[in-house]
Amino acid sequence: MKESKLSELLNRRLALLGERANLSLLEQCLHGIERECLRVTGEGRLAQTPHPEALGSALTNEQITTDYSESLLEFITPALPDPADTLASLDKIHRFAYSKLGNEYLWSPSMPCPLPAEEDIPIAYYGTSNIGQLKYVYRKGLALRYGKTMQCIAGIHYNFSLPEKLWPLLKEAEGFVGTDRDFQSSSYIALIRNFRRYSWLLMYLFGASPALDAGFLRGRAHQLEQLDPDTLYLPYATSLRMSDLGYQSNAQAGLTPCYNDLASYTDSLRKAVATPYAPYVEVGTHQDGEWVQLNTNILQIENEYYSNIRPKRVTYTGERPIQALMARGIQYVEVRCLDINPFLPMGIDLTESRFLDAFLLYCALNESPLLTNNSCGNATSNFLSVVKEGRRPGLQLQRDGQPVELKEWAAELLEKIAPLAALLDQSHGGDAHSKALDAQLAKVKDSSLTPSAQVLAAMAAHKESFAQFSLRQSQAHAEFFRSEPLAAEEQAKFEELARSSLAQQAELEQNEVGDFDVFVGSYQASILAISN
């Protein structure tokens, strides 16, 4: 029964979107990519240098910033309708960055290079303005709460939105009672629920972190195996980055990743950013007269909440993410569980992107029953099974309370995603999405084609440790970007962006009024005002 009901809603929606009048709608999905990567020395060690001034201000440059550490770059593309253009934009950012990196490299995988002692990992610095200091103190709080080592893991964030005009069309066809905005938000939450159910598939297909540098765990207990003196791994792992790795945030344990409507999501976040957590209270916000964390609550700010996918809305100046969501609803989703593929210069390619579009469209348009505690638990354990042992022959997952082999379920899911790939091809012309889906089917049939298997195979073939393999890949990608510099006018655009961002930061700092403590106080108050 269930299968046919699934298809009924999906078939209706496919038919509606396949009508000639609506077909071009799907060309208006938007795609943005954020790619994080560590700067490393020629020897593959963490670069201890400040963020290169030639890349502009990490505070105000919209395309090149820093994530947690001064050494952890983040490249941000604009949101564009064609992912080929998004990737072309990401490529240009890489080429510009390489023109300013001197003898440093961008580290190719998600898991970090051999790291120095915790105290020697530099926290990203954003200058003396109040907002710059706020970002710095927030990162000091993360160090205090979770340690710096964890914060050096890099990933790819894939931002995706469906066309705004799609929602009124579906809403009318389905007789939804409520506002357009409510329908749009509840549809995105439905996408997120399905993503929770099926994201294990992305980890099998794109997980690329089966091994890591042995020093990463800092001598703590773990369940990993020793591959060589410098490398820990699990033989069937797909993504140790997304596994628990022995780090559990007890403070965040009460926050469920499963929610059935936007209000319950914003409520739980509002509570978390306003509820003190005893171990943090014990430390306090100051030590020796210096700020060490923004507050002593479960979360300092919303972004501290760790999840595989986030509902998002572009914020206005001074507005908090949660306020934007409550005021204007969900605008797009941010997929946060994608590993950087160390074989690809940008860590992601067009094939992956085209498949992600079909996958996310399937999550959005398919029936999405509400999540119960039970189905939420199954989704979490399926995800954790796949990241730790996704390539284990005969691995079983839980589907609707019944065991099912990963390969069988994966093949069935791809079969169901195929009509969405076909619809995207129909809309865009060509067969790129169906071809991208075929490439994933090949990985399901043969696990040696997965990036995680290929990483282990490459290390074995070259008799390399994780760090040696990663440095070799980093050098190859550096050569790829450096061998073909940007055209002069493109280079000039980035130079101008860097210059104007530095001027913007200087202006912010010059015109700063008011004391930092007061600034933090009013920032806190902005969330408390909506928490009651």
From Swiss-Prot:
Give the pathway: Sulfur metabolism; glutathione biosynthesis; glutathione from L-cysteine and L-glutamate: step 1/2
Q: Which domain of life is it from?
A: Bacteria
| Matching Gene3D superfamilies | 3.30.590.20
Report whether Protein biosynthesis shows up as a keyword of the record: no
User: Pfam families annotated for this entry?
Assistant: Glu_cys_ligase
Query: Which BP terms does GO give this entry?
Result: glutathione biosynthetic process
Return the broad EC class: ligase
Q: Give the record's keywords alphabetically.
A: ATP-binding, Glutathione biosynthesis, Ligase, Nucleotide-binding
Q: Which PANTHER family would you find in this protein's record?
A: GLUTAMATE--CYSTEINE LIGASE (PTHR38761:SF1)
What is stated as this protein's family in its record?
Belongs to the glutamate--cysteine ligase type 1 family. Type 1 subfamily.
Q: Provide the protein name.
A: Glutamate--cysteine ligase
Originating organism: Pseudomonas fluorescens (strain Pf0-1)
Q: Which gene encodes it?
A: gshA
